[in-house]
């Protein structure tokens, strides 16, 4: 995390990752995406996602959701987000949409502290993402976003880890399950 925040060219890398995400989304068929509110120097996907919403073809409604962590179940729920919507802090002091509709996104964009071969993701260790994914039917398509320096060649999944379907960095698509 400290290495990510200390990158001298972090802003330039973020711009490149915004571009990679925007281009990658062009060919996707999903109409709803669950993302995250960036904390601790994480890449901010929301500008690219909002442009994705604005670029929807006529007659197609696209939605973005942000997670709400449920302490009791250890799962995530998603609430509709749009620029300017009223926000409040969740149980972990992370902003979440206040009083907007809850829905289950068709795709999840998730931050990665690090990533390994085969779609292995290193997160903060809370398990919210993995518990949520293992319980959802149908399972949303999952794409991780990270900076290239986060590649950990020896990272292996544990029994509980849910692999990503794709992983994007500022250098492009690093992994996509076929």
Predicted regions and their residues:
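N-terminal active-site beta-alpha-beta segment that forms phosphate/nucleotide-binding
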Residues: 1-104
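Conserved phosphate- and dinucleotide-binding cores of soluble alpha/beta proteins
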Residues: 72-178
């Amino acid at each position: 995390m400290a290495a990510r925040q200390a990158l001298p060219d972090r802003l330039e890398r973020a711009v490149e990752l915004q571009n990679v995400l925007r281009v990658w989304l062009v060919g996707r068929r999903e109409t709803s995406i669950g993302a995250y509110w960036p904390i601790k120097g994480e890449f901010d996907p929301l500008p690219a996602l909002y442009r994705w919403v604005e670029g929807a073809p006529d007659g197609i409604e696209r939605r973005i959701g942000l997670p709400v962590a449920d302490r009791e179940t250890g799962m995530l729920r998603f609430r509709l987000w749009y620029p300017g919507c009223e926000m409040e802090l969740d149980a972990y002091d992370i902003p979440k949409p206040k009083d907007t509709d809850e829905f289950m996104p068709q795709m999840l964009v998730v931050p990665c502290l690090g990533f390994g071969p085969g779609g292995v993701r290193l997160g903060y260790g809370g398990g919210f993402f993995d518990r949520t994914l293992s319980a959802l039917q149908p399972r949303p398509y999952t794409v991780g976003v990270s900076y290239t320096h986060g590649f950990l060649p020896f990272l292996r999944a544990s029994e509980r880890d849910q692999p990503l379907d794709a992983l994007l960095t500022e250098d492009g698509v690093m992994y996509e399950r076929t």
